[in-house]
């Protein structure tokens, strides 16, 4: 876990409620600058990683839409934050901003009221599906890493408490960090944490400034013991050859990863653990940016002979593995799971 201590805090006037003021008080030595909009920042004169290390933004989330997912959760909750300390080379959040520091939204009560109103309008009991057998699930961390945000504002714990006490709703988020402060909270199995996993040597290259795969795997038993439901997120799956041209290198590395997972987890933890699997989608703008800041990663991410292009819903040019090849890759991955960790149910894979 990084020790995030911003030297500059940008804030909008409407973000300075009691929670916003508490965040400012947490970092008394930071320079403060009021801005008109949290998502239109002035020129900061810092590079990509410096902004993530040194800048924090406080804002008020005005558009609190709840969006259907059907994959990681039933619904995507309004964002509690946007941006991350990490610098993952494939992150879709970074695609839409020139710089992307952590932005905390301080109107947490309005967020929870939106969720309560939304879930109360849904059918009950909930129809059983792959997201959860009992509760309507909401992904609370699609645009940030909640493990980092948790230490920056008490609002995240308040959100955890809201879901723990709610008779119909359950929270979930994916993370690439191990924040052991979360172990002091009792989530009553109403918060599902999903540790993102990939082969360790690949993670070191593309999961920039995040906790190691070894740390993430080692934390799974502990988070289960603390009362969390724990799943894993094999995402993104990156297909690559070895230095010697071995096209099965990615398969062999995932086999080793699965064996590490099988060895590390206790039987009762395995029994409740499920996985989601998402193969890589990359972006042309991000590819160009990475060539300047992390060109080695692009040797894995940008492989035109394996990929096809598509236009995203935002009008960007994305690439993904070619359809026929990907169908085979999916079957290979499912086969590896069945061979090495047959106890791990795949919730969805694409």
Protein language model annotation of sequence segments:
Residues 17-20, 108-118, 153-159, 210-219, ...:
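Well-ordered, non-membrane alpha-helical segments in soluble/globular domains
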Residues 135-139, 170-172, 190-194, 229-233, ...:
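Structural preference for beta-strand elements that scaffold enzyme active sites
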Residues 143-148, 178-182, 191-210, 236-244, ...:
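Conserved radical SAM core fold
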Residues 57-72, 93-196:
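Conserved Radical SAM active-site core
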Residues 1-74:
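Flexible, acidic/Gly-rich N-terminal and inter-domain linker regions that tether
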Residues 215-287:
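Conserved C-terminal portion of the radical SAM core fold
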Residues 79-96:
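Local cysteine-cluster metal-coordination motifs and their immediate loop/turn environment
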Residues 1-20, 256-350:
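Auxiliary Fe-S-binding modules of radical SAM enzymes
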